[in-house]
């Protein structure tokens, strides 16, 4: 990708083609969906077991077992989401037919915890579908009762999975998802996440989720968030260094001004360096660079102390991009603008990626504005940054 202005320097940076990586995730979901449609539940279970045991992940760190399970229940969940959003009279078969069939499959495989897990996860998804985006005050009684019923059914099923698969990350993650859904003030939240992290310490996603759910708006407090971030750094120091602190705070400080204001920013920045030292791949480089350049700027101007922290983190984008970046990953930058919110619906992956590329190029041009204005070409190469006269 080359960008230039007349009589100015050029910005040259390769743009990664992430279609193959994205296709892998989509194909995994589709495989789970196909196996469920064909009633090949034994094979689905075997594949989920293998992926879970190997801690296999997609390029964005989503566990492969999660993708298979998502595909297997997607027809059921999407049918209910469509029925609830259609606006016409609700049909009980549309709302209950699919999950009843899943329950029947579970009863036909009573000794298979992975199939039970798929059913439990479907109930959690259906609970959220009924919950929607309404506030507690505006949630209709029917929606409230159905939401609670699905969460309760998931809570009934998960102990069987945990007893059969005590060392399974996907089962532990489901337990955390259930706690998040039930929204009960509970000391077990940090304990459940600690357990999940101990089962899969190389995956940052549970650490980030724990930080979010330890905010006061969920189950925790600012004090608990800081304590757990420090504890996580101590527990995972051999893998992440100070990065264990950074991952727990990563999404929390982007969401909450007070959490950001209270951050130990020097330790957070040390964690960024430790993460890149251990994960120097361009996926990670782009994610951390986009976070510092774009995500952390959201909410600027709402809290003076938080703004100071944000500016220090934002400045880190300079060295991350200059010292570590060799190629641009547009989808990562697009997600950064949404705060890496996985619930955001993407209608067109192409337009979403194009927006990410525009945001990234704007941020990088701004970073090198003096060099470009002076006629210097800025070129990113596999061996590092190269500056040359235009």
Where are these regions (language model features)?
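Extreme N-terminal leader/anchor segments
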Residues: 1-97, 108, 321-390
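Eukaryotic alpha-helical solenoid repeat scaffolds
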Residues: 243-390
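Canonical tetratricopeptide repeat
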Residues: 116, 172, 207, 242-244, ...
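Residue-identity detector for threonine
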Residues: 2, 24, 28, 34, ...
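Residue-level recognition of tetratricopeptide repeat
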Residues: 112-115, 167-169, 201-204, 238-239, ...
């Amino acid at each position: 990708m080359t960008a230039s202005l007349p009589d100015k320097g050029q910005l040259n940076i390769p743009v990664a083609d992430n279609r193959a990586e994205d296709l892998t995730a989509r194909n995994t979901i589709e495989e789970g969906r196909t196996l469920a449609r064909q009633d090949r539940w034994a094979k689905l279970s075997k594949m989920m077991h293998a992926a879970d045991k190997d801690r296999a992940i997609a390029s964005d760190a989503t566990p492969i077992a999660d993708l298979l399970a998502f595909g297997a229940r997607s027809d059921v969940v999407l049918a209910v989401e469509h029925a609830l959003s259609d606006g016409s009279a609700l049909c009980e078969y549309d709302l209950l037919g699919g999950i009843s069939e899943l329950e029947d499959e579970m009863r036909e495989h009573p000794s298979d915890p992975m199939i039970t897990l798929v059913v439990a996860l479907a109930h959690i998804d259906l609970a959220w579908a009924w919950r929607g985006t309404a506030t507690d005050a505006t949630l209709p009684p029917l929606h409230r009762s159905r939401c609670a019923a699905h969460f309760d059914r998931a809570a009934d099923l998960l102990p069987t999975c945990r007893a059969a698969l005590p060392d399974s990350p996907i089962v532990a993650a489901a337990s955390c998802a259930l706690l998040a859904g039930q929204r009960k003030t509970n000391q077990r939240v940090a304990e459940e996440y600690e357990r999940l992290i101990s089962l899969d310490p190389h995956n940052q996603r549970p650490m980030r989720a724990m930080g979010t759910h330890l905010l006061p708006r969920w189950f925790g407090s600012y004090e608990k968030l800081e304590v757990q971030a420090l504890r996580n750094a101590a527990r995972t120091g051999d893998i992440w260094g100070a990065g264990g602190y950074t991952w727990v705070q990563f999404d929390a400080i982007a969401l909450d001004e007070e959490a950001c204001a209270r951050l130990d920013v020097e330790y957070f920045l040390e964690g960024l360096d430790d993460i890149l030292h251990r994960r120097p791949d361009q996926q990670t480089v782009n994610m951390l660079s986009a976070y510092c350049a774009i995500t952390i700027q959201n909410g600027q101007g709402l809290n003076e102390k938080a703004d100071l922290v944000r500016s220090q983190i934002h400045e880190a984008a300079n060295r991350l991009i200059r010292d570590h970046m060799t190629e641009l990953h547009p989808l990562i930058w697009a997600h950064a603008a949404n705060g890496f919110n996985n619930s955001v619906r993407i209608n067109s992956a192409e337009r979403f990626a194009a927006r990410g590329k525009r945001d990234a190029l704007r941020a990088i041009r701004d970073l090198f504005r003096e060099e470009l204005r002076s006629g210097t070409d800025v070129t990113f190469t596999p061996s590092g940054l190269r500056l040359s006269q235009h």
